[in-house]
Design a protein with these regions (language model features):
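NTP-binding/hydrolysis catalytic cores, primarily Walker-type P-loop NTPases
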Residues: 48-142
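Conserved P-loop NTPase nucleotide-binding/switch module
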Residues: 1-60
Length: 142
């Protein structure tokens, strides 16, 4: 999970012998990362993006995370492959102004909480799902 990734990153810094307080490590992590893209191996053996989470900063001693999109599994097809869709949390990410500054225009409707986009199993294209292609094309340009 994105939260687990942050804990592991913090642990790696501590194991490296760097003499920094935990708060300083968290401040560095929170200021360095804007998004966490969580990819997971599913029960069918495929890997899929299962969440896109924004790092919103530090609140007290806690790195604040906000899911933007999550993958919702709806079942499996006749071949045993996981089926599902991306669901928006309804939160407009704070980095949208940076996207616009780089000329990346995403339709705001994809951030509507009622918006979801089915993920098609297309073995010829590892980046399945229209949302993932559209969104990640923008993310990768940053």
């Amino acid at each position: 999970s994105p939260r687990d990734m942050l804990s592991r990153l913090e642990t790696m810094v501590l194991m490296a012998g760097v003499d920094l307080p935990v708060r300083a490590i968290r401040e560095q992590i929170a200021s360095a990362a804007d998004l966490i893209i969580h990819q997971s191996r599913l029960k069918d053996g495929t890997r899929k993006i299962v969440s896109i989470t924004e790092v919103q900063g530090l609140e007290g001693d806690v790195i604040v995370l906000q899911d933007i999109f999550t993958f919702v599994q709806t079942g499996v097809d006749q071949n045993g492959r996981v089926q599902g869709y991306f669901k928006s949390s309804g939160v407009l990410p704070r980095f949208m102004d940076r996207f616009e500054a780089y000329g990346i225009k995403l339709p705001l409707t994809i951030f509507n909480p009622d918006y979801s986009e089915e993920v098609k199993n297309d073995t010829s294209n590892p980046s399945t799902g229209k949302l993932s292609r559209r969104f990640f094309d923008g993310v990768l340009r940053l």
